[in-house]
A protein has these predicted regions:
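A short, glycine/small-residue-rich beta-strand->loop->alpha-helix junction that serves as a flexible
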Residues: 9-24, 89, 204-210
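Nucleotide-activated donor-binding/catalytic signature segment of Leloir-type glycosyltransferases, i.e.
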Residues: 232, 241-269
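Nucleotide-sugar-dependent
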Residues: 207, 261-270, 275-297, 307-315
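Membrane-proximal helix-turn-helix segments that form the acceptor-binding/catalytic region
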Residues: 27, 73-80, 96, 100-104, ...
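Acidic anion/phosphate-binding donor-loop and adjacent secondary structure
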Residues: 165-167, 171-172, 176-194, 208
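A charged, aromatic-enriched C-terminal amphipathic alpha-helix characteristic of glycosyltransferases
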Residues: 329-336, 342-373
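Conserved donor-binding/catalytic core segment of Leloir-type glycosyltransferases
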Residues: 7-10, 188-220, 228-229, 361
Length: 375
């Protein structure tokens, strides 16, 4: 019996149990029963045991830790040991070592482009100016050093097609919801007196958290029993301190912040307990053309969604309807928005294939067939 070819999915920025790496790409590979799968990444807060998938942690600690510079060399050692047939790199930092290793290991290299890092660095303002210049150079160097060595690109967003026009060999595989929930008939908000709002995921300034909190506090003046839960990974220590200093004692607000990524299931369970999912993203050039995974997942769970005003997102929210898109900074409109939310009949149309991972899974599985058996 011939041995299954090995596949590696690797990241520095994402934990080994990252939603896309493990539950979407990883489970889609495992389902074929054709490959020996290894997922390499950041140390998870609680690493799960997953049947027939090997989870390999090659970094832990703060992202600013200098030991992170050694990760590409650890990655190279794993490549030499495993001798994969296919390597899927999901962060730019590992590309130079992948280029080098490919010369003598002859694997197929796929770059899963989950972010437009150059745009993120320019607009998300998560680092000082001098570091942004250095980071942009390193991204450009890593992604462009030997682009011809990349056999195929995966774009996690449709907008990357126009943002990266020089890339010709690509497949768009969007980050849709890999979860299912029994369909509920159309409903209205169940609790008009003490609604439970939630913000979950990666908690950063560009997520629009501050504007959403201030919006909620204004609503809380009229609805004193309302509450807002904020749960997730807060990677910027300065922002963590700001949130805890300014809002930890605020009426109706519950903070559950971590300096490490939290398991997706933990956040999802909290979202399911809430009445309204808030997605208050700032409309930056690095964000406005993307479709947040949280939007897909919120609709899959049939949650009421309150989201930043954006024509792209509004077209999705209005379809079912799943909620409303608003200007979170328009505090004066809080009462009228709440009245509109109470009067809406949600999910008159059932969440459909536009929301779920299933179609993306088939595209990904076909891509692997094309890459490993090109004839």
């Amino acid at each position: 019996m011939s041995q299954k070819p090995s596949i590696i999915i690797a990241s520095v920025l994402k934990p080994v149990d990252d939603s896309r790496m493990l539950y979407k790409l990883g489970f889609s590979i495992r389902e074929t029963n054709k490959y020996d799968l290894n997922i390499i990444g950041f140390s998870s807060k609680k690493t799960p045991k997953v049947e027939n998938i090997r989870l390999i942690e090659i970094f832990s600690g703060p992202r600013t830790n200098l030991l992170r510079l050694l990760v590409p060399f650890k990655f190279l050692r794993k490549l030499i040991k495993i001798k994969p047939g296919v390597v899927i790199v999901t962060t730019f930092e590992l590309l130079p070592m992948a280029y080098l290793a490919k010369r003598f290991l002859s694997f197929k290299l796929i770059y899963d482009v989950q972010e437009n890092y150059l745009k993120n660095i320019s607009y998300n303002l998560t680092m000082p100016t001098y570091l942004r210049v250095l980071a942009k150079w390193f991204v450009g160097f890593s992604e462009g050093l030997d682009r011809g060595a990349i056999d195929h690109h995966i774009f996690a967003e449709k907008c990357y097609v126009s943002e990266m026009p020089d890339i010709i060999k690509y497949t768009v595989i969007e980050n849709k919801a890999a979860i299912s929930s029994p369909f509920k008939p159309s409903f209205q908000l169940p609790d008009p007196i003490s609604p439970h709002f939630i913000i979950g995921g990666t908690i950063t300034p560009v997520y629009g958290v501050i504007a959403a909190i201030e919006w909620f506090l204004k609503l809380n003046e009229a609805l004193p029993e309302a509450k807002l839960s904020i749960i997730g990974h807060c990677p910027l220590n300065s922002f963590y301190k700001q949130l805890t200093r300014d809002y930890e004692a605020a009426k109706g607000i519950q903070l559950e912040l971590s300096d490490q990524p939290l398991p997706a299931a933990q956040i999802r369970n909290k979202v399911m307990e809430a009445d309204v999912l808030m997605l208050p993203y700032q409309l930056l050039p690095s964000i406005k053309d993307k479709i947040p995974t949280k939007l897909y997942e919120g609709i899959a769970l049939q949650k009421v969604i309150l989201m930043s005003q954006n024509p792209l997102w509004k077209s999705i929210v209005d379809k079912y309807p799943a909620g409303m898109c608003i200007d979170f900074k328009a505090i004066k409109d809080v009462k009228s928005v709440w009245k509109s939310l109470l009067n809406l009949d949600y999910y008159r149309i059932q969440p459909d294939e536009d929301i779920f991972w299933e179609a993306e899974k088939r595209k990904f599985q076909q891509l692997l067939i094309n890459i490993t058996c090109p004839d």
